[in-house]
UniProtKB/Swiss-Prot annotation:
Subcellular location: Endoplasmic reticulum membrane
Recorded catalytic activity of this chain's protein: Cleavage of hydrophobic, N-terminal signal or leader sequences from secreted and periplasmic proteins
Principal EC category: hydrolase
Organism this protein belongs to: Ajellomyces capsulatus (strain G186AR / H82 / ATCC MYA-2454 / RMSCC 2432) (Darling's disease fungus)
GO biological process: signal peptide processing
Record remark: domains: The C-terminal short (CTS) helix is essential for catalytic activity. It may be accommodated as a transmembrane helix in the thinned membrane environment of the complex, similarly to the signal peptide in the complex substrates.
A GO term from the CC aspect: signal peptidase complex
Disulphide connectivity of cysteines: none
TM ranges: 19-39
The protein's role, per its UniProt record: Catalytic component of the signal peptidase complex (SPC) which catalyzes the cleavage of N-terminal signal sequences from nascent proteins as they are translocated into the lumen of the endoplasmic reticulum. Specifically cleaves N-terminal signal peptides that contain a hydrophobic alpha-helix (h-region) shorter than 18-20 amino acids.
Membrane side Lumenal: residue ranges: 40-187
Glycosylation, residue list: 125
Classification via SUPFAM superfamilies: LexA/Signal peptidase (SSF51306)
UniProt name for this protein: Signal peptidase complex catalytic subunit SEC11
């Protein structure tokens, strides 16, 4: 087994170069992700559709591109939101926008900027999303719950992510394959 590693042990400078190149690729991908996050004002500027609740508009596995710089959301717009206490992004259409009223405990507050209140529903669902919201939550808050509005998509390419989450052993195989390719790469 160690004999197969002998070419890498013989030239440590080449091995170090390959490890640094691999680190450069990973850090570049991270920087691109963070730059997209800043540009779009969204913690997750790219998400994958995980269910069929938005069919026929979006299929399971579609890759969505988000934008969160618009101050307002309109009825009919497709948004991605997180429910408080859950980490799974939900992609649904805005069905109703409530009037902007800055409130705290039911009383108007002066000097507090109002945030839109939204009601959403999946195109393929029979009822609105109030059952999906956190207990006691009747609507989404534009500022705190929304990750962004959908501005574009690529069909089916997100299935890789779905496969990796549904079959954890694939992650190990993929990482092992990538590591092997880095080690076998000759410059």
């Amino acid at each position: 087994m160690l004999s197969s590693l002998s070419p890498y042990m013989a030239n440590p400078r080449n091995t170090l170069s390959q490890v640094l190149n691999f680190g450069l690729v990973l850090s570049s991908a991270f920087m691109v992700w963070k730059a997209l996050s800043v540009i779009t004002n969204s913690a997750s500027p790219v998400v994958v559709v995980l269910s069929g609740s938005m069919e026929p508009a979006f299929q399971r596995g579609d890759l969505l591109f988000l934008w969160n710089r618009s101050p307002r959301v309109d009825v009919g717009e497709i948004v991605v939101y997180n429910v408080q206490g859950k980490d799974i992004p939900i992609v649904h259409r805005v069905m109703r926008v409530f009037p902007d009223v800055p409130t705290t405990g039911g009383e108007d507050v002066e000097g507090v900027e109002a945030s839109q209140k939204l009601l959403t529903k999946g195109d393929n669902n029979l009822s609105d999303d109030t059952e999906l919201y956190a207990p006691g939550q009747e609507f989404l808050d534009r500022k705190t719950d929304l990750m962004g509005s959908v501005r574009g998509y690529v069909p089916a390419i997100g299935y890789v992510t779905i496969m990796l989450s549904e079959h954890p052993w694939l992650k190990s195989v993929l990482l092992g394959f990538m590591g092997l390719m880095v080690m076998l790469q000759r410059e």
